[in-house]
Amino acid sequence: KESRQFGSQRRESEKKAVATALENLAMSAGFSDVNRMTWYLESEKLKELTPLFEGVNLDGVILRLEIDGEGNASLAVEKGGKPLKTLPKALSKNETALRLKETVKELKEQKHRAGESLERAMMESTVFRVDELEKILDNPVLAPQASGLVWTLEHTNGFLQKTDTGLILQDIRGSRHSLKQDAGLRVSHPHDLITAGEWADYMHVLYEEKRKQPFKQVFREY
């Protein structure tokens, strides 16, 4: 029993040490927290994957990374212009094919982590700069999650949209508020929506438009 307790305490201590090291690394790199550093690094990594989205030809079989409108990554396989349901056995040990499969796994994990990070940001009232939100909306894995959430700018709540002229916040009445570069937004908490008398309205919108959220934000018990 004492051995198990010691092992548990040691793991917890190591976990805290890693968290502290990551926080120090983020601060040293000029980020205010670990989440921001992680999102930046993952977005930069996504840029490096651009050729894989265009497709790789392996002995006449085209493999291509795809990300759908909900941020879900998958590996598309086709031969002779026709889609294949599975990867041919001849390519099962091909290094490029294995790398693509591993990349799909990493992108799925990235989506999961992002959902947890955004929920934590809501609970901690983390403020995001407009330039940070622009980068998030440029990331096809993160964008659907951020777009599905309600955001708060001072006393205005709404959904984020990216336009040719910049970010806007569209409120529950359909009014579009342009966001200045120095604006600070946070993920709305149900308390914000209740205070504004808009909680039921956003529930209705999410239900009618079948909007998906990365975590229970609007339909959260409060």
Feature-to-residue mapping (PLM):
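Non-catalytic terminal/accessory regions
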Residues: K1-Y222
